[in-house]
Amino acid sequence: MTSTPKNLEKQPINFDNLPLYLQGTNYGENVLRSDPRWLKWEKYLREFDMTREGNVTNTPKAIPSSWNPNDKSDSLELMNNNMGVYFFGPEAGTEHDAASVKADHAIPSNTSIYYYEIQILSRGKEGKMGVGFCRKSMQTNRLPGCTAESWGYHGNSGEKFNCSKTGEAYGPEFTTGDIIGCGVNFINRTIFYTKNGAYLGVAFKKVSDVLYPVIGLKSHGEHVEVNFGQNPFLYDIDYAIQMEKNKLFEQATKSPKQEELKQRQEFLNELISSFLLNNGFVETAKKFCPENTEVSDASIRKEISSMLANGQLDLAMTKIDCQYPVAIQECPDLIMSLRFLRFLQLVKVTHDQRLTKSKGTKQISQEEDLRILQPLMNYAQELSNDYEHTKSSNLQAMIKLSMGLLAYFDPFSSPLSFFMSSDFHKYMAEQINCLLLELTGHSPDSELRRFLQHTVCLNDLLCRNGCRSNTLFNVQSDFLSPY
């Protein structure tokens, strides 16, 4: 029986649920940015206050995840959560008696290479099955490849069909027990197939951009099941993609001329030095670029950042008050950031107190609980009254959202637990470091950070404008730090 099309509803795309080979592409990088793992608090901020000016997110397009019950022939039955397809139509007839079903989503072009596999559970009476890709307009009463804007590999003959009723010799026939893989390479616009893990070669060239996986059946009892990446593939598609990347890496890393190599090295040294200085690593920065290293207050900022990241808020505030006395007067965002961290500290202290009181006795009295909560509630009220005075809309939204922690006995297991994490405190330490840099007349972003941001944006722009080879790359994992 056809399953309810629940996976046709709009749902967040989870990076962990992507096939591994897609995680390493530009598509995977875009999914990661919209995934809570990228920066959990920024993800929640976007969902919490989507009306804030300038807060526009590019949601990645969904990838195929099942067969589409709303785009299939009536002669097909979908089963197993719309992953399986069974033909129960007439046993014989014309070419129009075939039955096809498309996937629930088109393949995003920035996947660079897309691949799926079909397992033949039963060849049925004649094994007249077709596997391939098609445009949205393909009729569902034909096998893939036998009609315009569709490409298919047929099991009963081993022929390939290129938008035509006439087939050409291509590969072996396939039958019950076989696993047929079908891939599209958007970089060179080709379609290829595999059989039982073996590569069969390029079948079609100059194919369209917007494609759907499609399966077609024609004889009674034919039964197949699809793997869109929810399970490991038989064919090593990860290796195939890495080989494509290696070709491009080789082109990009060809030995430059000696003069160009020297200029590159000087440029890289300056980038690294700027990053180290912004983060307070003065001595290391001198090693890379001794002539341009301006020490200024880098060591002091590093010490403050370390205190904040380690939860030593009082020490950090004392240091800031001593080293940057004007900052407290001139930077409301700095004051509010420190008060925000104080609030989170109070949330932790209050939780610890409630936990201690409830040990031994199963339930803490309401009166005792209120007594413990009162200082936190008072501080939260003061913070709520003042947070709108800050200039940073992100800081305002974070404070507003964090007030939800008050609703939970255990904030560490709540949906807002990321506020209590060491990663978030490191993030806030970085933001405060940026504020101190601005106060002392320096850019809050190092040259290296701006260069990397530019690289990521440039790669995205090239991908959107049809530079297909760039879609292979996930700048984050390929060139920075693997996740």
Curated annotation (Swiss-Prot):
<feature type="domain" description="LisH">
    <location>
        <begin position="264"/>
        <end position="296"/>
    </location>
</feature>
<dbReference type="GO" id="GO:0043161">
    <property type="term" value="P:proteasome-mediated ubiquitin-dependent protein catabolic process"/>
</dbReference>
<dbReference type="Pfam" id="PF08513">
    <property type="entry name" value="LisH"/>
</dbReference>
<comment type="subunit">
    <text>Identified in the GID/CTLH complex. In the absence of stress, the complex exists as an inactive anticipatory complex (GID(Ant)), composed of Gid1, the E3 ubiquitin-ligase Gid2, Gid5, Gid8, and the RING-like subunit Gid9, awaiting a substrate receptor to form the active E3 ligase complex. When cells are shifted to glucose-containing medium, the substrate receptor Gid4 is induced and becomes part of the complex, named GID(SR4). Additionally, Gid7 transforms the GID(SR4) E3 ligase core into a higher-order supramolecular assembly (Chelator-GID(SR4)).</text>
</comment>
<dbReference type="InterPro" id="IPR006595">
    <property type="entry name" value="CTLH_C"/>
</dbReference>
<keyword id="KW-0539">Nucleus</keyword>
<comment type="function">
    <text>Component of the GID E3 ligase complex recruiting N termini and catalyzing ubiquitination of proteins targeted for degradation. GID E3 is regulated through assembly with interchangeable N-degron-binding substrate receptors induced by distinct environmental perturbations. Required for the adaptation to the presence of glucose in the growth medium; mediates in association with the substrate receptor Gid4 the degradation of enzymes involved in gluconeogenesis when cells are shifted to glucose-containing medium.</text>
</comment>
<dbReference type="InterPro" id="IPR003877">
    <property type="entry name" value="SPRY_dom"/>
</dbReference>
<protein>
    <recommendedName>
        <fullName>GID complex subunit 1</fullName>
    </recommendedName>
</protein>
<dbReference type="InterPro" id="IPR043136">
    <property type="entry name" value="B30.2/SPRY_sf"/>
</dbReference>
<feature type="domain" description="B30.2/SPRY">
    <location>
        <begin position="45"/>
        <end position="233"/>
    </location>
</feature>
<dbReference type="InterPro" id="IPR050618">
    <property type="entry name" value="Ubq-SigPath_Reg"/>
</dbReference>
<keyword id="KW-0963">Cytoplasm</keyword>
<dbReference type="InterPro" id="IPR024964">
    <property type="entry name" value="CTLH/CRA"/>
</dbReference>
<dbReference type="GO" id="GO:0034657">
    <property type="term" value="C:GID complex"/>
</dbReference>
<feature type="domain" description="CTLH">
    <location>
        <begin position="297"/>
        <end position="354"/>
    </location>
</feature>
<dbReference type="GO" id="GO:0005634">
    <property type="term" value="C:nucleus"/>
</dbReference>
<dbReference type="InterPro" id="IPR013320">
    <property type="entry name" value="ConA-like_dom_sf"/>
</dbReference>
<dbReference type="InterPro" id="IPR006594">
    <property type="entry name" value="LisH"/>
</dbReference>
<dbReference type="GO" id="GO:0031267">
    <property type="term" value="F:small GTPase binding"/>
</dbReference>
<dbReference type="GO" id="GO:0045721">
    <property type="term" value="P:negative regulation of gluconeogenesis"/>
</dbReference>
<comment type="similarity">
    <text>Belongs to the VID30/GID1 family.</text>
</comment>
<dbReference type="InterPro" id="IPR001870">
    <property type="entry name" value="B30.2/SPRY"/>
</dbReference>
<dbReference type="GO" id="GO:0007010">
    <property type="term" value="P:cytoskeleton organization"/>
</dbReference>
<dbReference type="Pfam" id="PF00622">
    <property type="entry name" value="SPRY"/>
</dbReference>
<dbReference type="InterPro" id="IPR035782">
    <property type="entry name" value="SPRY_RanBP9/10"/>
</dbReference>
<dbReference type="Pfam" id="PF10607">
    <property type="entry name" value="CTLH"/>
</dbReference>
<dbReference type="GO" id="GO:0005737">
    <property type="term" value="C:cytoplasm"/>
</dbReference>
<dbReference type="InterPro" id="IPR013144">
    <property type="entry name" value="CRA_dom"/>
</dbReference>
